[in-house]
Amino acid sequence: MGNCVALEISCDQTLNHACGCLFGDRNYILKMEANLEALQNTMQELEERRDDLLRRVVIEEDKGLQRLAQVQGWLSRVKDVCSQVNDLLKAKSIQTERLCLCGYCSKNFISGRNYGINVLKKLKHVEGLLAKGVFEVVAEKIPAPKVEKKHIQTTVGLDAMVGRAWNSLMKDERRTLGLYGMGGVGKTTLLASINNKFLEGMNGFDLVIWVVVSKDLQNEGIQEQILGRLGLHRGWKQVTEKEKASYICNILNVKKFVLLLDDLWSEVDLEKIGVPPLTRENGSKIVFTTRSKDVCRDMEVDGEMKVDCLPPDEAWELFQKKVGPIPLQSHEDIPTLARKVAEKCCGLPLALSVIGKAMASRETVQEWQHVIHVLNSSSHEFPSMEEKILPVLKFSYDDLKDEKVKLCFLYCSLFPEDYEVRKEELIEYWMCEGFIDGNEDEDGANNKGHDIIGSLVRAHLLMDGELTTKVKMHDVIREMALWIASNFGKQKETLCVKPGVQLCHIPKDINWESLRRMSLMCNQIANISSSSNSPNLSTLLLQNNKLVHISCDFFRFMPALVVLDLSRNSSLSSLPEAISKLGSLQYINLSTTGIKWLPVSFKELKKLIHLNLEFTDELESIVGIATSLPNLQVLKLFSSRVCIDGSLMEELLLLEHLKVLTATIKDALILESIQGVDRLVSSIQALCLRNMSAPVIILNTVALGGLQHLEIVGSKISEIKIDWERKGRGELKCTSSPGFKHLSVVEIFNLEGPRDLTWLLFAQNLRRLSVTLSLTIEEIINKEKGMSITNVHPNIVVPFGKLEFLEVRGLDELKRICWNPPALPNLRQFDVRSCLKLPEAATEFPRHANE
């Protein structure tokens, strides 16, 4: 027994010694089971610490913070070691079953030893991770990105605009760029595209800041958006505006930034907000969007860009994308109908998108035809129009400060779609409706009207016409104006606005008693046989119809009517006697009608202040009318059969309030005489010299200081001379500038006698010149005469500097326009025909027009 035991001990020692010599430290096998138990326990502790840490991280991330990189790294390493330990423990049972000699050795010694080494290594690794898994702080504020991407919906035609804006912004000298345009035109989308373009490369900028300003946002609201973008999310309610400005300024002073301000309605004081001055040295820039061009000026931009509606092709492309292919392919007629719907949007992206989406579910021809009918008759009733389009556009209306300016704007909705109305005509309506004080002097009231028009154009509620004398209204803006004028559709009966819709009769469904304004202009109405009781009607527009007859009783019950326009009804030869019942009438326009006489009862219109009888070729006389209208301020007889003669001059002198006179004169002596009567000549704005025969006529630029339009028709005048001096009340009157101050239109037709029109040098503000069928004219400006004028008046050097339209036609002897063809920087149209001796004209002026 003892010998046996002694032998076992001897063998173990021998084996262990051999193993130790051959394979190193036996502890890898001897302590395998203990290390495995320690590894499992430590691993469990590590997983618990990991779970606790993850809970803390989630809480902080929910607050908008970002986990620390070292925390994320630790968690990643824990994840890796968990996987490795799990794989290691899968071999635990196999390796422990191989142990022998009371755990001193393994039946597969090499495998057991290697396993033991891995267990010990993992144990130490896990212990190390456990020791490092103690974090006081697990997350921090997310650093602000240099630029935040903005979501942009499907657009068309944007790339070109972005390119233009980007190129302008990136100019070294550019500091502030204003993007202006009407509501819904895509200004915000353009600004967002500029923002996103910085994602492609910062171009040396440190930060791009986006701020939505909106209409009623105060400075502090702008400041808090900037502070948030700078990563300063602390509460700012207890901090003053000045302190916030200081924080912002201190940070932005050391950065090269781009500040994008969306939807400005008025000037923003950048200094009060804390935006440091933009200089060439710091290179920072500001871009903003606005509906008003005035805001661009108030912000003192050094660059501005108008965002226009889409051209027809691009508008159709956008509309198709919003509608989708299914409706457009559901019937062969729908694409044609869809184009009509798209045309109603007039290129406004907001309308194209909203209406396009609304039409995406309509797949029958009948549905599309119904929509076209709705859009033609009452667009605001179209689904989504009142909810998504009109309210957006209404912000521009709400921003108008003066209630009378708002009334002026709403009045513009009475005209047809795409109709260009003359500014002068619009102002006359407004004055008689009481929107502009008519008691001011003529220049004051007229200037006020032009100021209102300018403000509406700059607010993109009106648009410039093809000619500078006209404006128009975008169709969608017009729908918005009608919607507002009808109290948002609640009082539609107060308006009857159906111009240009091919009516042959006055509609029968009119609520005459509630009616306030009616526009049936540009229709096919020939007869008005009905009578009406319309106690509240103030404006009635019937111009440009086919009127032949108006019922005797039609005007009998319109006591509040102020504005009546019957112009451009060439077959209308008489007015009913009941017109005398229009006791409130202040404005009547009978121009371009066939009126032969004014009814005797016309004298009862005692409140009439504006009478337009221009282009009335059949009107024989107005003797006695003028003296019966004591309040008359505007009398227009330009190109009328009624010419100024001695008796009419005497009658006109009795009009104490006369401010504007347009006249037709046949007699050269009358022309000379009227230029000597201050009260009359000072009011002349347009003058037609018709069938006049005289060797010489003299036009006095002092006397005719208010002349805007001169027409010479069918006359024989050898020479036209200009005088800039005249005697009045015993003293000599002259002007430092010898020319016509306001003369902008000269039209000469069938003039016989003069060889040149050098006197036009005195019309330095001329914008339109038409010379036709005047067979003796050899040149417009004669060299010798021109040089003699410029020698005396050196400030008259370059002729036609403001000319926009030039027409020379049927001038058989015309050899040249001017001896030294001037540059015409503003020329928009040059029309030359049947001037056989003018070979150079066709190439001479278009070149200047395009410069």
Curated annotation (Swiss-Prot):
The LRR repeats probably act as specificity determinant of pathogen recognition. One of its GO terms (molecular function) is ADP binding. Probable disease resistance protein. This is Probable disease resistance protein At1g15890. Keywords: ATP-binding, Leucine-rich repeat, Nucleotide-binding, Plant defense, Repeat. GO terms for biological process: defense response. Signal peptide: none annotated. Residues 139-441 form the NB-ARC domain. The lineage of its organism: Eukaryota, Viridiplantae, Streptophyta, Embryophyta, Tracheophyta. The keyword Nucleotide-binding applies. Belongs to the disease resistance NB-LRR family. InterPro entries: Apaf_helical (IPR042197), Leu-rich_rpt (IPR001611), LRR_dom_sf (IPR032675), NB-ARC (IPR002182), P-loop_NTPase (IPR027417), Plant_NBS-LRR (IPR050905), WH-like_DNA-bd_sf (IPR036388). It comes from the Eukaryota. It comes from Arabidopsis thaliana. ATP binds at G181, M182, G183, G184, V185, G186, K187, T188. LRR repeats lie at residues 514-535, 536-557, 560-582, 584-605, 607-629.
